[in-house]
Amino acid sequence: MAMDGFETRQRTRWRTPEPEAGALRHPTLAEIRHVPGKRGLPLIGVMPEVILDPLAFSDRMVAKHGPVYRFHALGKWHLHFVGAEANERILFDEHGIFSAEAGWGPLIAPLFPGALLVKDGAEHRSRRRLLGEAFKQAELSGYQRIFARDIERRVESWQGRTIDPYVEARALTFHIAASTFLGVPLEEEAHVAIHSFAAMMGGLLTLVSNPKLSLVRRRGFAGKARLEKILSRLIEEKRASPGSDFLSRIALLEDEDGLLPVQAIADSFIFLLSAAHDTMASAITSLTYYLASHPGWAAAMREELAAAGIDDFREAATATLPLLDMFYKETLRLNNPAPVIWRRAVKDFSIHGLDIPAGTMTGCNLMMTHRLDGLWHDPLRFDPLRFTPEAESRRSRFAYVPFGAGVHKCLGMHFSQQQSKMFLAHLLLHAELECRDRRPPSWYHWPNCRPRRSLSVAVRPRCRGK
């Protein structure tokens, strides 16, 4: 959305380049018939199966076709790749074969044209370097103070109740979005901003991409427009009187031409907000459920905190706590917030003896790699001891990549890890959790991992010294 009064120089900086016409074309069936797979229904392909249960669909495809398979969806052929070798080849991308812009662009670019995820090459490096300034440890410490306050207030409201972790996690991340990221109180404008954001995300995920044909898509664009308007004003206010919130830090970023254009900041910030909001809600839900379901691990982690002399959960953010780290890693292995990472091949390549043509949509299926027999013993069992130093040394480092890998590795990885450790430590120090579900939950793995049905966790205050 262009903004009135912008100088020409501001409008052109960080501009999203138009793709070259005909630079890439999607492969025909004849070109990839040698890759095993499935066409599905006319036009929509396998989308009904994928939407019904993404994990079950992937599990069937891997069982029948192996670690590389094709499927037809919405008029195009796509390939999924499973395994550590594919993660290394595609995500690390040593030879520059894969484009994140062309892979994620069709899904993300209509609503997030300025997102870091849909940039490649020099433009990506420049943006990542600038935005990385907001993720340095000194900055993270400022965000943590705000985040800690939100955790204390929200988790205190859980005490003595039986909660649905996903509902509560969404409420918590609502507060975090307003305070840690936007730096505004939870008043009317914050509610408008976050509900606009929710409408925007709904518009992103609808299968009908044309706003003229989809009410959900129109609401998405309208929500983004409202959010941009609010952000534009907030950015100017933050520049005049910055705080310790995330938006204040980004608003003050400069390149060789000075302060970044407001629109460029808004574009980048909106996507960072969306990624943090959804992935954090997913992680907090899963951490709460698994903590309630594994009291033995809860006791062991409490002993670890006591041995480290930690009685303030804030200290856990940067402390060396191997058991907490292993618990967190195992949670993300089973319930990865980003189940699939998309790229598109810009050159021909070969993998597992298969020749793949340029133009192919290539997805690294992390949810299946993280459950792959051979990489993981008894892969569906929750077992944080998979992540002892000895166990990790026997595995490829690309077997576990919850935040991606290579130049597009999640910029907020350390932020997410530190917030999750603080959250875990607060629950361990201040609450006793008990899972009340009679059967294991079913998880839905798109676009982020979340439970299919309500979960039930009883929370009661913990007697200190217990």
Where would I find each of the regions flagged by the language model?
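Cytochrome P450 proximal C-terminal region
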Residues: 2-23, 31, 35, 62, ...
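Cytochrome P450 heme-thiolate monooxygenase catalytic core
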Residues: 2-5, 19-35, 58, 99-106, ...
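N-terminal membrane-proximal hinge/A-helix region immediately C-terminal to the signal-anchor transmembrane segment
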Residues: 2-126, 145-153, 378
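Cytochrome P450 I-helix active-site segment
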Residues: 33-43, 148, 244-248, 290-338, ...
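Conserved cytochrome P450 K-helix E-x-x-R motif and the immediately C-terminal K′/meander segment
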Residues: 46-66, 233, 311-352, 373
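Cytochrome P450 catalytic-core helices
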Residues: 279-298, 302-304, 414-429
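Conserved cytochrome P450 K-helix/beta-meander segment immediately N-terminal to the heme-binding cysteine loop
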Residues: 364-391
